[in-house]
């Protein structure tokens, strides 16, 4: 992973959080762009990650996917610091098209060929009526650069989703999306610390979940 010492360059620091467990995660079905709330465990995870962030970082601004599960995961920080949550459509999860709302078992039984393609190559396969991962990656990178230009040398909290974080990791590491299936999974309410110096992104933390240890 690309790394650089913060003191070497002026940077925007992004703390990017995957939402806490949602009702769809709990129920084992794909939500994608469908708006679903956090589960009771997800609410506890959100509280834990917010407390960690408040204690660890000086957050200057908060952005989020417009979906409830992402916004409510970072709401604790917004409330504690009296900061608005700026909702950005380009930080939203991947649109799974006709697979939205289906369990993995339903996908396997009804879209067997699609299930195999998706399971084996999530970075490349595009579900019917859905979004390509390459499009998601491009919109996320563009939006983060736009935020960095606006916020400057600040620490920015971002509430988002697993596909967003994994696609961003591929971009930063220069990996083709064909390799996305080999990137580490990011659990609910874990976070990534990623800096941007105006030209390049650098990963300092990825999938950090130490704040969740007492919840299990």
Regions found by a protein language model. Give the residues of each.
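Short active-site segment of divalent metal-dependent hydrolases/proteases
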Residues: 22, 164-165
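Short basic (Lys/Arg) and small-residue
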Residues: 161
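Short, hydrophobic/glycine-enriched beta-strand segments
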Residues: 13-19, 158
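Active-site-proximal alpha-helix that buttresses catalytic centers in soluble enzyme cores
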Residues: 21-87
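Surface-exposed helix-capping loop/turn segments at secondary-structure junctions
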Residues: 55-61, 149-156
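Phosphate-handling substructures
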Residues: 79-139, 195, 202-205, 216
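Active-site signature of alpha/beta-hydrolase-fold catalytic machinery across serine-
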Residues: 76, 167-171
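Acidic, low-complexity terminal tails and accessory targeting/binding regions
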Residues: 2-12, 94-109, 149-154, 170-216
């Amino acid at each position: 992973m690309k790394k650089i010492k913060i003191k070497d360059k002026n940077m925007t620091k992004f703390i990017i959080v995957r939402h806490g467990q949602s009702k769809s995660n709990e129920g084992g079905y794909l939500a994608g762009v469908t708006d679903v709330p956090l589960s009771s465990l997800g609410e506890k995870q959100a509280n834990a990650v917010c407390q960690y962030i408040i204690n660890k970082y000086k957050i200057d601004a908060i952005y989020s996917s417009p979906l409830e599960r992402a916004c409510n995961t970072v709401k604790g920080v917004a409330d504690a610091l009296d900061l608005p949550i700026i909702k950005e459509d380009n930080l939203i999860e991947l649109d799974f098209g006709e697979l939205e709302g289906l369990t993995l078992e339903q996908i396997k039984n009804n879209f067997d060929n699609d299930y195999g393609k998706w399971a084996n190559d999530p970075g490349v396969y595009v579900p019917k009526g859905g979004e390509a991962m390459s499009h998601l990656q491009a919109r996320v990178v563009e939006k983060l650069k736009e935020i960095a230009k606006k916020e400057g040398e600040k620490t920015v909290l971002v509430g988002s989703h697993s596909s967003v974080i994994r696609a961003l990791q591929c971009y930063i590491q220069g990996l083709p999306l064909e390799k996305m299936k080999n990137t580490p999974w990011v659990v609910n309410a874990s976070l990534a610390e990623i800096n941007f110096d105006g030209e390049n992104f650098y990963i300092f933390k990825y999938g950090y979940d130490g704040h969740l240890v007492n919840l299990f």
